Structure formats: C-alpha cells, structure tokens
C-alpha cells in the first residue's frame, strides 16, 4: 500500500505550527524544547515568536517574577497577569515594558537609572491602549487597574517615586469606584474582601487591591507624615483597620497581610496622643498577631533545615516588623517626648538588624565584593533600618544597619535602599557633629544633639528628594542625590 504524505508549509509557530496541528498532523519542523528552558504560557510567547518582545516576556518569567516574589508567592503576578497578557494588548505591552526596565535596572550601577528606548516604546503604547480600553463601556474593570499597577512598578524602577505615588492614588480611585464588586461592608463600615465572589475578574480585582494596599503601607512609611491626601486615599480605598480574626494563619503571606493594618495604625500621626485604652487595644492586637505567627511557625516552619530560602527570608522579615511594632508601642506608652528612650532597646535593635540581614540574603556566603540588585513591590527592610538609625544612638549598631542598606542595590517598592542609607548616614553625621566630640558609645550623643523629626519631600517630576531634619530648636535641609 502506497502512503502519500501531504506537504504543508510550516508557519514557524513554536513549539508546533498551527497549520499542522489544526488539521491533526504532527509538526516535524522543530525538535523538542529543552526540559530546562522556561516555557511561556500558551499564547504569550507565540504572539512575538523570536522577537525582542518574546525575549522580554521570557525575562519577565525568569527574573522579574522571581524578584517580585522574593518573600511571598503572589498569585496575581505568577498567574493572573500572565494569563490576561495572552488576550489583552495593553497588559502584554505593559509587562514587556516592565521586564525591559527591570533588565536595565539589573545591569546598571547605583549611579545610573534605567533608560530603555525599547521599554519606553512599549510603555507609551500600553498607556495609549489602556486609555482607549477604559473609555469603552464594555471594558472589564480589572484591566485599567492592572495597567495602573504595572505602570506604578515602571515609574518606581525609573526612580520617579513622586510619579509612582500619583499613579497609585489614581489606581486607588479606580478601586474605590469598583468597591462594591470587590468587597462587602460590615456594620461598622469596614470593607472586607468578599470570599463568596468567584468571578475570575473579581478575584483578580481582589488580588490587585491587596497589592495596592501593600504599596500604600510603603508610601505611608515614606511620606505619610507630609502627605495628608494619602491618609484620605487609604481610608477611602481600604476602609478602617480591622480587628484580627481568631482563626490561625494558614501561611506566611496571610500573616503579612494581617500585619499591614497594625503598621498603618502606628504610622504618622499613628498612636501619638492616644489615650491609655486605645494603646491597650492596639497592644492586644500586636500580642494576638504574635501568638498566631508563633503558632504558624511552630506548626509549619519549625525545621530550619527544610525551609526554602524564600521562607527563611519571609520569616526574618516578619520578625523585623514584629519587633519594630512592639518597640513602638512601648515608646508611645512610656517614652513620649524622650529622644533617648530608645537606648533600652539596643539589644532588640541589634537583633532586628540580624534578621534584616537574613531577609536580604546577606547571611549567606558570597564571593567578596559581590553586590546584587533587587526589585520587588512588597514591604521591605529599608524603612525599618532607617528608623533604627534614627532612634538608636549606638554608633556600632547604626553603622551595621547602614552597611546592610548599602550592601546591595535594592528597590523595595517606593523605598530605595541606597538613598535611604544616604539619608540615614546624614542623620547620624548630624548628631555626631552636634555632640562636639568623638562618638564611641550612645551616651556620647547628648539629648540636645538629637534629630527629633525627619520629613521627606519628593520633587515633582524629578528623581531627587529633600529631607528636613528637625531638632529641638531649628531644622536642617538636605537634598538627596539622585
């Protein structure tokens, strides 16, 4: 019997051409992919096969996703955004732009900023497509919100924090508009994510809102004391802060989410001026969180040898925030007005710095003079290390904290470790110069030499910022170099 094989011109779509597979034939045009290669979700890579766009999408899956999940897995980044990018051009182009700027960020030194013409082209295209999509009545609500979220990341990577915050506020307004679809409101007016809503678009909106809240906490800790609009935006978008649930934490990411409200309660103006009963309620919430966290670690993460690097970093990060919050409560309860009250927590500050080193991977052996670059949009250690340097007078601990901030080039959401270290070092130098002698221990810095307040003012449209250090009498301004 003679078999006739019909020849069909291959359309060069990987891993198998549609002209072959659509008619039930096997495509012989390509060898099998290597088992070690990264496979993009079906539809994403094929759109830009063998192009710079495909390369950026692969960089996103290999590098950017890992960075964005350095502490906690995130279903929004890992699954939802990639799925939506298959069918939505503005999200696909935004992801390509983000990957391009991220790649540039990893290549450059601390004195340079990402400047990708390729990335900028796709960024501008994504903006135009997002505006066009949002003007259509039939457009699903999660698309412009996801676009805005990715745009915030791109602005952060370019060092344009003021622009990133403006975009963040715009995203909050969109979330507020779609609030009834995302969550339910209890009798106290607080908004809870509604677990009963199972629409894929609504679940994506819930995940996006959760990430916006994490970014909000970062911004709160950066400029909350000078940006009154931020306080309003937070309350309108995320409601009030909530009591903790009695049920145990199921994972480290859930413990992180519960921590956010406690951080916001303490952020400026925070607990200042609160009466004893309110401070007690807040202290109870912290103790409850600590109990739930300890139970989770004892149950699922007690064997240190079996922990992954991500889990070790996440636990250390949460321990840093735990001690930060506990110390803050003690200050509000017993030490308001005393700039030297922090001296009693010197040992705790040292322990926090050690945990910060674990969270940033500095506890692991590296070749000498090896510095890495990191980018993520989660809460990080730079804000806490800055507060330690501002509070602790001990010169050794201060320099140890600055060393961690300078060891790697980290963009932790809106917090840049290198710039935060510069601001913290300037604070330390101010206090030491005002002490009038060589500082060898905490007591060498007198109370009148202490910096009482630090305010950060972002320069509109620029990569620079102004820091104002307030003393008991007078203040001093300093421009942070870009």
Feature annotation, model-predicted:
Residues 1-31, 71-72, 139:
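N-terminal cysteine-rich, zinc-dependent DNA-binding domains of eukaryotic transcription factors
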Residues 33-88, 92-101, 106-284, 302-315, ...:
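Intrinsically disordered, low-complexity acidic/Ser/Thr-rich segments used as protein-protein interaction/activation
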Residues 71, 371-379, 395-482:
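C-terminal region signature
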Residues 122, 129, 167, 348, ...:
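Alpha-helical solenoid repeat scaffolds, predominantly canonical TPR units
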Residues 129, 136, 174, 296-299, ...:
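Residue position in alpha-helical solenoids
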Residues 141-149, 307-332, 371-399, 403-406, ...:
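Amphipathic alpha-helical protein-interaction segments enriched in hydrophobic
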Residues 285-355:
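Long, well-ordered mid-to-C-terminal structural blocks that present hydrophobic/aromatic surfaces
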Residues 337-388:
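Structured C-terminal portions of repeat-based eukaryotic scaffold domains
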């Amino acid at each position: 019997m003679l078999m006739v094989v019909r020849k069909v011109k291959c359309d060069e779509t990987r891993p198998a051409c549609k002209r072959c597979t659509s008619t039930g034939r096997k495509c012989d045009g390509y060898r099998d992919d290597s088992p070690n290669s990264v496979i993009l979700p079906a539809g994403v890579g094929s759109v830009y096969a063998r192009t710079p766009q495909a390369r950026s999408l692969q960089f996103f899956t290999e590098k950017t996703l890992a960075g964005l999940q350095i502490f906690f897995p995130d279903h929004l980044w890992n699954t939802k955004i990639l799925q939506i990018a298959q069918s939505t051009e503005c999200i696909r182009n935004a992801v390509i732009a983000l990957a391009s700027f991220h790649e540039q960020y990893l290549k450059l030194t601390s004195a340079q900023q990402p400047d990708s013409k390729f990335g900028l082209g796709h960024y501008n295209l994504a903006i135009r497509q997002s505006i066009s999509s949002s003007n259509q009545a039939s457009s699903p609500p999660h698309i412009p919100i996801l676009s805005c979220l990715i745009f915030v990341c791109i602005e952060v990577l370019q060092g344009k924090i003021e622009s990133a915050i403006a975009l963040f506020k715009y995203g909050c307004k969109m979330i507020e508009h779609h609030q009834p679809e995302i969550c339910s409101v209890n009798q106290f007016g607080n908004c809870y994510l509604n677990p009963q809503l199972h629409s894929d678009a609504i679940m994506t909106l819930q995940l996006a809102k959760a990430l916006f809240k994490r970014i909000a906490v970062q911004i709160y800790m950066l400029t909350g004391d000078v940006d009154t609009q931020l306080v309003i935006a937070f309350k309108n978008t995320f409601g009030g802060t909530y009591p903790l649930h009695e049920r145990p934490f199921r994972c480290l990411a859930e413990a992180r989410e519960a921590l956010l409200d406690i951080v916001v309660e303490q952020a400026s103006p925070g607990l200042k001026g609160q009466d004893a009963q309110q401070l007690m309620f807040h202290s109870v919430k912290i103790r409850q969180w600590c109990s739930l966290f300890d139970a989770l670690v004892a149950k699922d993460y007690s064997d240190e040898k079996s922990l992954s690097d991500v889990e070790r970093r996440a636990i250390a990060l949460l321990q840093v925030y735990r001690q930060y919050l506990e110390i803050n409560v003690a200050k509000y309860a017993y030490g308001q007005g005393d700039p030297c009250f922090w001296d009693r927590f010197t040992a705790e500050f040292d322990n926090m710095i050690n945990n910060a080193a674990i969270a940033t991977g500095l506890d692991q052996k590296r070749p000498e003079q090896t510095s890495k670059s990191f980018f993520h949009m989660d809460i990080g250690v730079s804000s806490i290390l800055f507060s330690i340097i501002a509070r602790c007078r001990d010169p050794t601990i201060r320099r140890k904290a600055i060393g961690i901030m300078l060891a790697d080039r980290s963009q932790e959401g809106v917090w840049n470790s290198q710039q935060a270290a510069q601001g913290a070092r300037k604070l330390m130098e101010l206090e030491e110069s005002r002490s009038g002698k060589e500082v060898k221990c905490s007591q060498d810095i007198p109370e009148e030499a202490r910096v009482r307040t630090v305010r950060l003012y972002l320069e509109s449209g620029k990569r620079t910022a102004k820091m104002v250090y307030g003393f008991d009498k007078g203040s001093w301004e300093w421009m942070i170099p870009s």
